[in-house]
UniProtKB/Swiss-Prot annotation:
Protein family per UniProt: Belongs to the skunalikevirus portal protein family.
Location within or outside the cell: Virion
Protein name per Swiss-Prot or TrEMBL: Probable portal protein
GO cellular component terms attached to this protein's record: viral capsid
Function, as annotated: Forms the portal vertex of the capsid. This portal plays critical roles in head assembly, genome packaging, neck/tail attachment, and genome ejection. The portal protein multimerizes as a single ring-shaped homododecamer arranged around a central channel. Binds to the terminase subunits to form the packaging machine. Necessary to ensure correct procapsid size during capsid assembly. Once the capsid is packaged with the DNA, the terminase complex is substituted by the connector proteins gp15.
Region forming the signal peptide: none
Quaternary structure and interacting proteins, as annotated: Homododecamer.
Keyword Transcription regulation carried by entry: no
Any one GO biological process: symbiont genome ejection through host cell envelope, long flexible tail mechanism
Sorted UniProt keywords: Capsid protein, Viral capsid assembly, Viral genome ejection through host cell envelope, Viral genome packaging, Viral long flexible tail ejection system, Viral penetration into host cytoplasm, Viral release from host cell, Virion, Virus entry into host cell
Main location class: virion
């Protein structure tokens, strides 16, 4: 008779998408790991909320690069950066979008347009109970979701469930009941009722009353727990799944670790936002580079890689920018975290830096050096 199998049953818990904890798993190791994943999600979501969505217009050029014109203050700028979009504020909305994206295969957003002007009025989470046309939805797919049955967290926790459950039996309880092989359900109900009463009775001071026919036999064994190496392994698997170093969470990451995390985790999400928002929120005629169009529009996101630069690197950039200017004074101020100033939209260069269209124009440009002298020096 398989008494143990009839009396006790084990079941795998389902992942709670809000708390990132598995139902019925109350072990400290599981809760610790779940909180660890929640911190990872918060870090990624908070990084995304720092960026700004820039609605821009490019002017086509027959020679050289197309020039960019900012459309700050447009309907897209207002909705993407400022309006609450059905939540407390704009940052709260984008934080929820990213958190959903970290635990689901995709996130659908519904864009609300003005029927008369075609302007974007709002951007909301799609209603699961309503059917939409594909072109009506901004669909963001998750690069971290594994499949429909599990997530990175659930997959990692599954590997430790067996060990914890196998070591869960701590003792035997002899109760005042007769075991009828043909009626194990009644026996099981009596056993569970007895255990429940004992737990409720011991909730006050740890003591519980039992009758004179009830006996508790504690098993002399080491209860199953996770050691440090196993915890570190789980943390490593989780961090690797998000291309993250633990120092990122601790605030002690090196510049290389920060840039790797940003390039591997944050920028792929930003690129997807750029492409999907541009494709679904800007009309085809305004978006495509077609004959007859002088301008075309995009939504771009600043990757903010300059925020990882050290003060020395920013100073070096300032000096190099004088020799070969690529940023105006105001652009440099913004990259250093300062505000633009009036009259700062100029390039500053020393006298050794000149503007040329072709490298051959540099030959003989200095008054004190002739073309022949330069050739001889070479």
């Amino acid at each position: 008779m398989n008494l143990f199998g009839k009396v006790v049953s084990f079941s795998r818990g389902k992942l709670n998408n809000d708390t990132q904890r598995v139902t019925a798993w109350q072990n400290e190791a599981v809760e610790y790991t779940s909180a660890f994943v929640t911190n990872i999600h918060n870090k990624i979501a908070n990084e995304i909320t720092k960026v700004e969505f820039n609605h821009v217009k490019y002017k086509k050029s027959d020679v050289g690069s197309d020039t960019l014109i900012s459309m700050a203050g447009s309907d897209l700028d207002e909705v993407l950066n400022w309006s609450p979009k059905g939540e407390r504020n704009s940052m709260d909305f984008w934080r929820k979008v990213i958190k959903k994206l970290l635990r689901a295969p995709y996130v659908d957003l519904y864009a609300v347009f003005d029927d008369n002007t075609g302007e974007l009025l709002d951007l909301l989470f799609a209603d699961d109970k309503k059917e939409y046309k594909p072109e009506e939805l901004v669909r963001l797919t998750s690069p971290f979701y594994i499949n429909e049955d599990t997530s990175i967290l659930d997959n990692a926790l599954a590997s430790i469930q067996t060990k914890l459950e196998q070591g869960k039996l701590r003792g035997l309880l002899k109760i005042n009941a007769f075991l009828d092989i043909d009626n194990t359900q009644e026996y099981r109900e009596k056993a569970l009722t007895t255990i429940k009463n004992m737990q409720e009775g011991s909730s006050y001071n740890g003591l519980t009353p039992v009758d004179n026919k009830t006996e508790i036999v504690e098993l002399k064994k080491d209860y199953s727990v996770l050691n440090k190496d196993e915890i570190d392994l789980i943390k490593s698997e989780l961090l690797t799944g998000y291309f993250m170093n633990e120092n990122i969470l601790l605030g002690t990451a090196s510049q290389e670790q920060q840039i790797y995390f940003y390039n591997s985790t944050i920028i792929p999400l930003l690129i997807q936002l750029e492409k999907e928002l541009t494709y679904k929120l800007i009309s085809t005629n305004r978006r495509r580079v077609v004959k007859g169009n002088l301008y075309y529009e995009r939504i771009i996101v600043d990757n903010q890689l300059f925020k990882f630069a050290t003060l020395k690197e920013l100073i070096d950039l300032y000096h190099e920018n004088i020799n070969g200017p690529i940023f105006t004074q105001n652009q440099l101020l913004v990259k250093m975290g300062e505000q633009p100033i009036e009259g700062g939209d100029v390039y500053i260069a020393n006298l050794n830096a000149v503007a040329v269209k072709n490298l051959s124009d540099l030959q003989g440009s200095r008054k004190d050096v002739t073309s022949t002298d330069e050739t001889n020096n070479q």
